[in-house]
Design a protein with these regions (language model features):
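Proline-aspartate-enriched helix->loop->beta-strand connector
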Residues: 34-40
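Short, flexible loop segments at boundaries between secondary-structure elements
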Residues: 149, 153, 192, 200-211
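Hydrophobic, often amphipathic alpha-helical segments used for membrane interaction and targeting
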Residues: 46, 51-178, 198
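Active-site charged/polar residues at nucleotide-handling catalytic sites that mediate phosphoryl
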Residues: 32-33, 178
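Extreme N-terminal starter segment of soluble prokaryotic enzymes
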Residues: 1-5
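Short, solvent-exposed loop/turn segments at secondary-structure junctions
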Residues: 11-13, 43-48, 88-91, 189-193
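Acidic/histidine-rich helix-loop elements
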Residues: 7-21
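Conserved, well-ordered alpha-helix/loop/beta-strand core segments that scaffold catalytic motifs
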Residues: 174-183, 189-194
Length: 211
C-alpha cells in the first residue's frame, strides 16, 4: 500500500527558532518517515533553476529556506526523489491581492486583522507533538481562510483554492505513478488541513501528523 505523510513547516527561520520547530526537528521527522519520494512546496520552474545552478537564489518565487538548507541536501544524500508541486503564476500574482480594491485606510485595517489571525495561529504552537501540525492549528487556519474568502472571493479562489487543488493533484499524480511507495508531502503548515481533507479520501495509508 502507498503510504503518504504530511509535514507542515514554518518558512521563517526566526519563527522556527521561536516556536521550537527547528530544521533539526524537521530532519528527524523526515528520517523517521523514510520517504522514497518527497513532494515539496517548490515551483517546478524553481526546481529546474536549482538543478541547473544550485546557488541561484535571487529570483522571485524561490523555494523557502528549509529547502536550500535541509530538504534538497537530504534528498541528494539519501537518494530520495524530489517532486516539485507548488503552483502560482508570478506575472499575475499581485493582480489577485486579497486586499486589492479597498481604500488605503481599509487595507490597513484588513492587514491588522490578518496579523491578528496570524497571532492566533501561532498561539496553537504547543498543541500536539509537532508545532503547527495539530487539529487546533488546522482549525484556526481554516477560519482564517474563510475570512479571507469573505474579503475577496476571487483572490482567495486563485491564491488558495486553485493553488491547493493543483498542488494536491500533483501529489495524486505522483501516487499514481509510484504505487506502494512512501511519499512525504512537505508544505507550509497553512496547507495541512486541505491536504489532509483531500488525501484521506484516497486508497492510501495517510499519516498526519507524523507523531
Amino acid at each position: 500500500m502507498t503510504v503518504v505523510g504530511i509535514l507542515g513547516t514554518i518558512h521563517n527561520p526566526e519563527l522556527r527558532e521561536k516556536y521550537n520547530c527547528s530544521l533539526a526537528l524537521y530532519e528527524s521527522l523526515i528520517t523517521e518517515f523514510k520517504p522514497d519520494i518527497i513532494c515539496g512546496e517548490v515551483h517546478p520552474l524553481s526546481w529546474q533553476k536549482y538543478i541547473k545552478d544550485r546557488n541561484n537564489k535571487g529570483y522571485w518565487g524561490e523555494p523557502a529556506s528549509e529547502y536550500w538548507e535541509l530538504i534538497f541536501p537530504l534528498c541528494e544524500a539519501n537518494q530520495i526523489e524530489f517532486v516539485p508541486i507548488d503552483w502560482f503564476e508570478l506575472d499575475v500574482w499581485n493582480n489577485f491581492d486579497p486586499f486589492g480594491g479597498y481604500s488605503e485606510e481599509r487595507r490597513e485595517e484588513l492587514q491588522q486583522i490578518d496579523d491578528e489571525w496570524f497571532f492566533k495561529q501561532m498561539s496553537t504552537h504547543a498543541s500536539g507533538d509537532i508545532p503547527f501540525n495539530s487539529v487546533e492549528f488546522d482549525e484556526m487556519t481554516r477560519l482564517k481562510y474563510e475570512w479571507l474568502n469573505e474579503i475577496n472571493p476571487t483572490a482567495h479562489n486563485i491564491r488558495w483554492v486553485v493553488r491547493n487543488q493543483i498542488m494536491i493533484q500533483r501529489v495524486k499524480n505522483t501516487m499514481d505513478s509510484n504505487p506502494n511507495k512512501r511519499i512525504l508531502c512537505i508544505v507550509g503548515a497553512d496547507h495541512n488541513y486541505l491536504f489532509q481533507e483531500t488525501l484521506i479520501k484516497e486508497p492510501i495509508l495517510l499519516l498526519y501528523p507524523l507523531r
